[in-house]
């Protein structure tokens, strides 16, 4: 029985490793407007050499950039990032949104994530993109209810907050985020499936701190951007 147990454990570990590596064959270079996102192990296609390059290896953290919700957020970041932007990236995952903000010229990014793997993934992706680690700080924890994380993030500090998570989490976040962003700062959200759009809109509309400035769609996914009054 011990041999069988060991074999099944070894097979399961091999399957996990196979899964971690197999998805890579589906992650190919792609563009979002003038930005080229590519995995670190692929070369830059000749026809895209003039684009703004972002290289990503998610490792075990979430975020290749291929999902519609990430692309929706990237397009909003393109509109709002300036050279002075301080950016808060909630649920940073691989760091793709924060790194995009920095590549677009943002001054600094602060990321939070529940998954400790995000810290390693962001560090590796910063290196792959030639970005100094001090430009992007990441902490593990929940900004919604962890006072230590909330204090570390700082208050009334950010020009932009971005969260590509899930609609139900966005609904909770819209209560907390206003205390962390400056007046007239924007909160860019996605991860919202179309059937949840009305619930997210209603939550923002019921919050006196925000006014919705834009709602965009891609496929069955939605991005809501709100400005702090």
Where are these regions (language model features)?
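Short, small-residue-biased leader/transition segments that mark boundaries at the very start
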Residues: 1-5
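A short, charged helix-loop
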Residues: 50-58
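S-adenosylmethionine
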Residues: 114-228
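Conserved SAM/SAH cofactor-binding pocket of Class I
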Residues: 60, 64-143
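N-terminal auxiliary segments of SAM/dcSAM-dependent transferases
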Residues: 6-47
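Conserved beta-strand segments of alpha/beta enzyme cores
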Residues: 8-10, 36, 108, 135-137, ...
């Amino acid at each position: 029985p011990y041999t069988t147990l060991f074999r099944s454990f070894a097979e399961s570990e091999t399957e996990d490793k196979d899964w971690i590596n197999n998805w890579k064959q589906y992650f190919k270079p792609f563009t979002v407007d003038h930005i080229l996102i590519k995995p670190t192990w692929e070369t830059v296609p000749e026809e895209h050499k003039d684009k703004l390059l972002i290289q990503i290896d998610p490792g075990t953290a979430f975020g290749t950039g291929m999902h519609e919700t990430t692309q929706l957020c990237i397009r909003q970041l393109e509109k709002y990032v300036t050279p002075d932007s301080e950016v808060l990236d909630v649920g940073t995952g691989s760091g793709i949104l924060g790194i995009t903000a920095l590549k677009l010229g943002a001054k600094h990014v602060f990321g939070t994530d529940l998954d400790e793997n995000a810290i390693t993934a962001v560090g590796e992706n910063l290196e792959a993109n030639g970005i100094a680690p001090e430009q992007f700080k990441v902490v593990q924890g929940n900004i919604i209810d962890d006072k230590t994380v909330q204090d570390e993030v700082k208050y009334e500090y950010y020009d932009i907050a971005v969260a590509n998570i899930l609609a139900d989490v966005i609904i909770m976040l819209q209560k907390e985020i206003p205390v962390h962003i400056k007046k007239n700062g924007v909160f860019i959200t996605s991860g919202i499936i179309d059937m949840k759009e009305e619930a997210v809109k209603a939550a923002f509309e019921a919050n006196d701190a925000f006014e919705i400035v834009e709602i965009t769609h891609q496929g069955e996914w939605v991005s809501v951007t709100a400005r702090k009054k």
